């Protein structure tokens, strides 16, 4: 179907988002066209502001509007325990359970040779520097229970073995192949509680 150029560009823009195919992109484009102009401008402004005002924490790699982030800045947090997760959305999922009191390190990805992603392409070098510079007693590996997440956890645990830092892996109350962000608070809580040393 041929659309006027502004609609085609809008459809193409929506298709760049994960999980949005051509049909959904067309629906979203026409939905936006039916919105009030003030709502469209507010939506566009929210997108621009989020992109402009948010960055990654220089300490942990979590998404933040200040550096360091609110978690790294919290003096009540146990700085000796670092929970390693793949994405910022995993931090948000962990924080929902309101039980974990340590700090985080966000890898912003996982090792995936099939996609050409190696250890140097994610925040593993920053993790090693952080563990060298800070007094950390335990690293909790909370990567996703899929092939990439398991490979990443195994790689990090092998790297940390000589350091003497206790390395644990969250328990698998999470489904294999699942993502942390989709787990409910109870499942995450049980997985954290049942972590094991690796």
Swiss-Prot record:
Family matches, as SMART domains: TOPRIM (SM00493)
Gene Ontology annotations of biological process type: double-strand break repair; recombinational repair
Keyword DNA repair: yes
Keyword Secreted listed: no
InterPro entries membership: DNA_Rcmb_RecR, Rcmb_RecR, Rcmb_RecR_Znf, TOPRIM_dom, TOPRIM_RecR
Similarity field: Belongs to the RecR family.
Function according to Swiss-Prot or TrEMBL: May play a role in DNA repair. It seems to be involved in an RecBC-independent recombinational process of DNA repair. It may act with RecF and RecO.
Record protein name field: Recombination protein RecR
Organism: Bacillus cereus (strain ATCC 14579 / DSM 31 / CCUG 7414 / JCM 2152 / NBRC 15305 / NCIMB 9373 / NCTC 2599 / NRRL B-3711)
Primary gene name: recR
